[in-house]
Amino acid sequence: VHLTMDAFKALFKDTKLEVVRELSQHGEFASNLFVNIKTDKSVIEHVRVVGPIRKYNQVEITKTDAYKLGINPPVRMSGDLEGSETVTLYTDLGSITLENSCIIAARHIHATLLDKETYHLKDKMKAIIDTEKPGVIKNVLVKTSDTYTYELHLDTDDANAFMIKNGDIV
């Protein structure tokens, strides 16, 4: 879950957002705080807030989560939120309903421009996952920035299907 300052204050008041663990992409971190995601059908509890504070609110879930919540979010890249699902986030300190905020994150690769050239990466490419349970993922998008660390991003549904975990080399 990524939050704006207004949403953060609605949920956590004056609580401080602290770094628990740096993530692989420069400047991003797993925070010390958690929210609950609520819809008319169900709740998913204890979802970590990812820092830093953002310019937009974004809730990324899996298709499995979507079934539980009874919603049908689109598969999108981060920040492409128009027409996405509405969810309510709550904590012991507050709640907020976020319209056009919930997506299933598209499969993507973070890469520098040098990585993109070196590995001949292009948008909507195929990624071959060579593991104990191998397969091919189509339509993998490539995000480039000089600050990125070269890495494939999958959600837990995809990772579980290929029997891979965070940090595995594929």
Predicted regions mapped to residue ranges:
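Active-site phosphate/oxyanion-binding loops
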Residues: 134
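Short beta-strand-centered segments at strand-helix junctions
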Residues: 1-40, 45-92, 97-130, 138-169
